[in-house]
Every structure is written in structure tokens, then in C-alpha cells.
Amino acid sequence: MPDHTTFAARHIGPDPQAVAAMLDVIGVGSLDELAAKAVPAGIRDRLSADGIAPGLDRLPPPASETEALAELRGLAEANTVAVSMIGQGYYDTLTPPVLLRNILENPAWYTAYTPYQPEISQGRLEALLNFQTMVADLTGLEIANASMLDEGTAAAEAMTLMRRASRGKSNRLAVDADVFAQTAAIVATRARPLGIEIVTADLRDGLPDGDFFGVIAQLPGASGAITDWAALVAQAHERGALVALGADLLALTLITPPGEIGADVAFGTTQRFGVPMGFGGPHAGYLAVHANHARQLPGRLVGVSLDADGSPAYRLALQTREQHIRRDKATSNICTAQVLLAVMAAMYASYHGAEGLTAIARRVHGHAEAIAAALGTAVVHDRYFDTVLARVPGRADEVIAAAKARGINLWRVDDDHVSVACDEATTDEHVAAVLEAFGVAPAEPVASEIATRTAEFLTHPAFTQYRTETAMMRYLRTLADKDIALDRSMIPLGSCTMKLNAAAEMEPITWPEFARQHPFAPASDTPGLRRLIGDLENWLVAITGYDAVSLQPNAGSQGEYAGLLAIHDYHASRGEPHRDICLIPSSAHGTNAASAALAGMRVVVVGCHDNGDVDLDDLRAKVTEHRDRLSTLMITYPSTHGVYEHDIAEICAAVHDAGGQVYVDGANLNALVGLARPGKFGGDVSHLNLHKTFCIPHGGGGPGVGPVAVRSHLAPFLPGHPHAPELPQGHPVSSAPYGSASILPISWAYIRMMGADGLRAASLTAITSANYIARRLDEYFPVLYTGENGMVAHECILDLRPITKATGVTVDDVAKRLADYGFHAPTMSFPVAGTLMVEPTESETLTEVDAFCDAMIAIRGEIDRVGAGEWPVEDNPLRGAPHTAECLVTTDWDHPYSREQAAYPLGKDFRPKVWPPVRRIDGAYGDRNLVCSCPPVEAFA
């Protein structure tokens, strides 16, 4: 175990004495003995003579927090923070310090998980409902989701949504030529495997001939032009096509919104609402539709329902659309969204209100008008919002260089055109410097009135009551207090790896040298960032045993998708494009099947044994049956059942022998680092979750980073980008070349500070804690799956099905009751219905792990009282959970259990009390009565 003065000792919860105590309960004498019993010998890495795991010897020795931050400061100072007037979907913004301090830098917000337990997630859900209301108001559409990964993927989702919703049979999509290049490229990526034909044209002239299921255009366009798309919308509808507009939300405070001109879908980004550019991300994309398309929306959708006392409460609505339920029939493969950034954007809108946003928009437009007035006839478009396109015949490079000399980056369109984008941070001095670069004198602006919007927006009190810093600070605290995040309790969610997100790892993400970089800035501005990215890629290669890594995918789902596209393109390059069968075990996460479907593959399910392992005979039969068309096997390792399958090498060999590729889902990599490398035991490609194994916080449901790691033969097919020729020539999956680059310093810092020994110790400790929980709880809740030697990996599944059958107490009852004990529930009913999957991670102390076990054992005692008939099935502390303070102080208490049993089942000194803000929520009511925007204040009376 690491010395107590190291960062690793701060990150890893149990000290050596605690680890020894847990190992004693497990029945092994050392961590190495535990690894030998749990991890199959055939794949387990052997330590070198000096005790270092293979691959990890390529990592630098561990640095202290001070040393790592000093190195990061050096990388940051190598960058140049120029004034960005590049635009193209990314704009500088002024983040209110009250939001920076109370959201982005606040662990109560950034360490939470996706709000699957809504009763203890009401703060986040309210903030996300504000986000949905903000987007719906500004776009003029009824329903928005919360949220998308970025603008480009939102456009791709808009395309597939329109195809699902279209009544016609056409497979053609019309895309306007003035759509952002990165957006058009991502749409093309998504269209290709789905058999969608894209027709790119200047749609100001109307739709081209032929049938289309959908149309995509931009408002304003990439050139800055504001086009009235009403005629195009009408024409498209007459011909049976739906229309999606990529709309700038700040511009929509002034111009007519998409919904008012009849558009069916609006998509875009909320980045300029207080979220730094961050060299490309993370930012919250958005997608809004008319109400009749609500069930076609991808991703998370927050709705209003009622709790057990009839009070309004929030929850995730219409979850049957999503990948974790519908698998390959889901509306999307998206799992992680961008919750933390959506909260930032929503609170930015709340802080400024409609009047403030409109004033910002007018100021931005005013600066653009000043530039246009000076340029005169060189301006290409008459109507624009923030971006001025100028003709400079043969002088583009000269103008760009002159601006650069003045500390400003402009956008070179071609030899003869330069684009200038203004934003919230633009000043009069910036405008003057731009005019000098063009060699023109200031002129009196001529008003180009673009304010055609008449509809009100952001009228709900959520956007009018919090204009002072005091009010906003208290609002954010009130919301945070309604949730359970890692700052209050362990979150033992299986398959989610809710480990520590250390303050030292988080600190650099707000440094301007990282945060204020445009993703298309000149490479000369970002050498430090590029070196950081190179370091992280090399370290991940060393850890995983692969040969190349792309950091572009901004979620695990996108990493999966990128990996499957690389496999498809590899087969095609060898003259085998017909290989389209993807084998997936029945136990797999739903994202696997959804990603395979999006990649144009046909999913064939492989059976599993009763012990959770892949049925090797069934696999071989399926491989033989589909040998000529076999593309891929997707398999999670360790398995989704929380064990190390001993047949993994044979499984990989069977697929390779048939010409297929093996996709090892890296969701559970926290159980492998320093112990085994997927790139060495049979994997051809994996996605990794930096927001699990490598400490990027979950943010309440995003951001995430899902790098894709490959063997050398797949490296040429990794994601490329239209504005990054240095990348491979594969197809882009994210709007920015390096995805959510501004949070990569978190994982860089984690690896740099842990070092080889610390990383291996983290995996071993995670396995130890999981096996300790399995031993302590097996007597009360049988552990469903173990490996050959009776061991689990880094998580264990508790089987409640016999308990439910005998007593009527459900897994839902236990999950809700845990909130009364102060804990977030483990993962419910995945991968097996009626079970709980527990993953403690290495960061939790033995004291916290024991408290969780004590709570579970006490709950089993309550279940036994129900089973014995002491409490009715329909009226007991479990079925009544969670209990609010309000329900306990009512005059009438007609339950067979006491108020003290309800609120303090293990006494008042057990742990700090968490008061759930609402009772159990009626999910079915919320889906039947869909409300996805802020409810009126009267609803809470």
C-alpha cells in the first residue's frame, strides 16, 4: 500500500490496517493473493522484478499534488490566451463568479450521479427542468431534453429523430451549405451506416428535386447570415419532410424562433450561456421538438409528477425510450449527457433573465454592426447577428496575421474571405484592433434591425427571482441540499465507479489558459494543451495495452460508436464491407446494442449461463452460423455480472478465428488497471470512461469522456475532424477535434499523482472493498454471482428476488429505504431484474463501507418483520420510504411503525441525517401526464 503522505493514500480510502481487516474477512492473506484468486491467471499481468506491472513502467513516477499542479501550470503557461473572434459555434463568455464558485467548483453539484433515484435528486432535477424550460421558451417549441453532448451530435440526433417521425419512405436528408462544417461532418458520420443519403445544397433557393424525410439548416448560418427559413419550412412540409434548425440561443432573444416559423426540431449548444469554450468542451447541447414528437426524443427528459402525498416532484420521464431499456431499439445510444453544463447554462439564464440576455445580445450585435459599418461594401450579408463575413480578395492571410499580431484570432474562410465573430466578451478595444487589421477606419454604424421576435420568454419565476448574487447563492444551496452527492455519502452504484474527484485534479479546469481556448485556435496557441493530450493518450496506451487512443469521443456511448465505426471501416478496407453481425451477450449494457444499431450492425444475442458467464458453446455456434458476416463481439470485462470470466481468452480467440474483431467494453476498467490489459488479452478496441476509472466527476449525469483505444490495425480509422488535419482520417463523432478537452487535466493529474503503484493499489482496493461487502452481506442478501474461487471483481450483485417472493418487499422498497439511512441506492435491476449491484470503489473508508453494510443489514431486519407479519406489506417503513420531515410532523400518524423508526432506524448518532425532500414518486402518473417545463408556482401551494 502507498505511504500515507502520498496522493494515492489520500485518494484510497482504507488505510493498510483497514485493508488487512477486510482481507481477513474475505479469507486471504494479501492483496496479491486476492488478485490471484479473482483475476484469471491466463490474463493477469506478472510484475517485473522491481514490482511494477507491465505497461505501467512507462508512466512517470508519482508526483505530489504540489508538483503535479506546478507541471500543469507550466503546460498552461505554454498556451497563448488570444481574443477569440473565430466563432463557428464556439464563443467566449463571461461566467458569473457566483455560478463558477457554487456550481462548477462545488462538489455538491459535480460529484452527483444521474438522477435515477429522483427522491434524493430533486435539486438537480429542478435545475434541469429550468434548462428544458429555457430551451423551449427560446426556441418556441414545447419540449426540450436535458441535454445533448454537443451541437454536432444534437444535429445527428435530430436527423434520426426526423427519420423515425417521418411518414414517408425517403432515405434522403437535405442539409444547407451554410451549416457549421463540424456539424455537417458529424451528421454525415451518423448517416452513412444507416443508409441515409445526404444532399447538400444552398437551401435559400428551396429544396432540391426529389423526396426527403428531413431538412437541416442553421440560424444564423456558419457565414453569419440570418435567413428567413419560413418559406423553406412550408415547402418541406408540403413535400412531407420535417425541418430541424440549428439555432443560436442568444440570437433567439432577438430573432424569430424556429417554432414560430413552423420548424419541427431545434438543436444547438448552450455553450455561450456562461460555459467556457474549453478547447472544445464540455458543453450542453440541446434538442427541442413539438409535443407530438416527445416520445421520439433521445436522451434524458425531466418531467413533473406527484409524490405519495400528492406534492409535485420531478423525475426522469419516458425512460422506456432509452438504451438501458430498449437496447438496439432505443431512440439513441446516449447515456451520459451534460448535466453539470446544462445546470450552468440554466442558471446563467436565471441570473440574467430575459432582459439581461436581450441586453447581452444587443451588445454583441452592436459590436458586429460597428465592424460591418467600417468594412462597408466588403460585407457579404445584410442580415447578421454576431458574425460578419468580409470579402478581402487575396488578402485573407494578411488580415488574419495582422489580427494575430494584435492578439486576436479571426476565422479564415478561404483566400478571399475572413469571418469575424463577436461575443459577450468583445470590447470596443477589440473592435478597434479588428478594424486596424483590416486596414479600415471606424464608421458610424447603420442599424441593421434584426429584432423580429415578439414572443415573451423566460417569464417563469425561476428566471425572475434570482437576479442578485445573494438570491442566486441561496437558491443553488437550497437545490444542492435536496440531493445526495459524494460530498455527503458514498454512492455505491454498480457499473458507475463513483470514486473521489480530488480537488487538486479539478483545480486546473477553470484556468483561462485551458478554459478560454477555442477548439479551432491556431496550433501555435495551444502547445501546452496538445502536450497534455499527448501525455494522456500515451499513458492510456500504456495502461490498456493498446497501440493508439483518440480522446475525441465526449461520452462512453460515443467511444463505443467510434470503435464500432473503426471496425466497420477496417473490414471495408479489406474488401469485407458485408461483415455486419455484432454478437452481444444477453447480460450486456443496453448502450452496446444501441451503439451497434447506430453503426449499421445487426445484433445477435449470445446466451449466458446461470452463473453469468458467456455460454461458450452458444458463442461458438453463433460464430459458426455467422462466420462470413461476423464483424464484432462486444463484451464487457470484468463482466456486467461483476466477475472475471475465466474463458475470456477463448472467447476472443473464437471470434478472431472467424475473422471478427473483439470490442472489450471498458466500463469496468477500474478492476483491471495494473492487473490485466484488454489490448493484450484479446481486445482489438475498447472505449474507456474517464468519468469512471480516471476521476472525471459524473456531474449529476455528465460530462463524460469516452476515449477509444485500438490496436495498430484499427488506428488509421480513429475519428478525424474537418478542422484538424493532424488527426487520423476516420469519421468525427464530436464537434471538437479533442472532444471535452478542458476536463482532460483531471485524468492527467490523477494518473500523474497516482503513479504505477498507486493505480494498481486503487484497483486492488476496489476489489477488496467489493469482496468485503459481498462477505458481510451474503448472509442477508445472497450474492448472485462469483468467480471460480468465490470472488467478485470490483462490484457484487445482491439478489433480492427470493426475498421479494417471500415477503413482497421489492428492490425499489430497499432502494428508497436506503435514503432514510442516508445512502444513495446501488444500481437497481441491472443486469438482473430484482437485484442491487454494489460498487464501493477504492475511495471509501472502511468506516463508510461498514456503515453501508450496517444499513443494509438493518433493512434486512425490517424485511424480516414484514415477512413475519408484524408489519403489513403495504404499510411498513420500506414501502413508506423515503420519509420526509413534513410527513413525520403531521398530527395523524396511523402507521404500525413509529416516527423514530421511519426517520432514525439506527438511532440519531448513526450518521448525519439526510432528509429526502419528497416522498416516493409516482412515475406512471408523470408519464401519463407529461409536463416537461417549470410548473406554475400554484402547484406547490
Swiss-Prot record:
* Reported cofactor(s): pyridoxal 5'-phosphate
Alphabetized InterPro entries for the sequence: GcvP, GDC-P_C, GDC-P_N, GDC_P, PyrdxlP-dep_Trfase, PyrdxlP-dep_Trfase_major, PyrdxlP-dep_Trfase_small
Superkingdom, natural source: Bacteria
Q: Name one GO molecular function term.
A: glycine binding
| EC number(s) from the headed UniProt entry | 1.4.4.2
| Reactions the enzyme catalyzes | N(6)-[(R)-lipoyl]-L-lysyl-[glycine-cleavage complex H protein] + glycine + H(+) = N(6)-[(R)-S(8)-aminomethyldihydrolipoyl]-L-lysyl-[glycine-cleavage complex H protein] + CO2
Keyword annotations of the record: Oxidoreductase, Pyridoxal phosphate
Listed SUPFAM superfamilies: PLP-dependent transferases
Assigned GO CC terms: cytosol; glycine cleavage complex
Can you supply a Gene Ontology BP term from the record?
A: glycine decarboxylation via glycine cleavage system
Q: Does this UniProt record's set of keywords contain Transcription regulation?
A: no
Q: Where in this protein does the record say N6-(pyridoxal phosphate)lysine is found?
A: 692
Q: Name one Pfam family in it.
A: GcvP2_C
On assembly, the entry states:
The glycine cleavage system is composed of four proteins: P, T, L and H.
Q: Which HAMAP family match?
A: GcvP (MF_00711)
Free-text function comment from the UniProt entry: The glycine cleavage system catalyzes the degradation of glycine. The P protein binds the alpha-amino group of glycine through its pyridoxal phosphate cofactor; CO(2) is released and the remaining methylamine moiety is then transferred to the lipoamide cofactor of the H protein.
Family to which the UniProt record says this protein belongs: Belongs to the GcvP family.
Q: What is the protein named?
A: Glycine dehydrogenase (decarboxylating)
Q: Could you tell me which species this protein originates from?
A: Mycolicibacterium paratuberculosis (strain ATCC BAA-968 / K-10)
